[in-house]
């Protein structure tokens, strides 16, 4: 998958995490090839692409959204209700082709204001869901 990303983004300053050099301020894209880093990295990101949306079903889309990031993922997101809801709100994007990805992702790279706006919408959505466990607990306890 990383080779596909490297090919697709050829021409945009990019590096794999394991090959990064601290003195690379011109980087626009960092491909994460190490486990256990995402939560911390989302804090410094502008946009997130969440994996497994082309295979088994998208991974956690709430984590980057909670950090105020617009979220991208592949077409297999039936396992994530929040992904569906964020698509409806316009702060998350399911992509199924290179053309679809280009038409949605590249404008955000070129428009930081729009990126921040969509990220704020994603974060507001997650915050609006914060009391879901309080609503579910009585239902769970009532069925024990």
Where do the PLM segments sit?
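Nucleotide-activated sugar donor-binding and catalytic core shared by glycosyltransferases
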Residues: 1-144
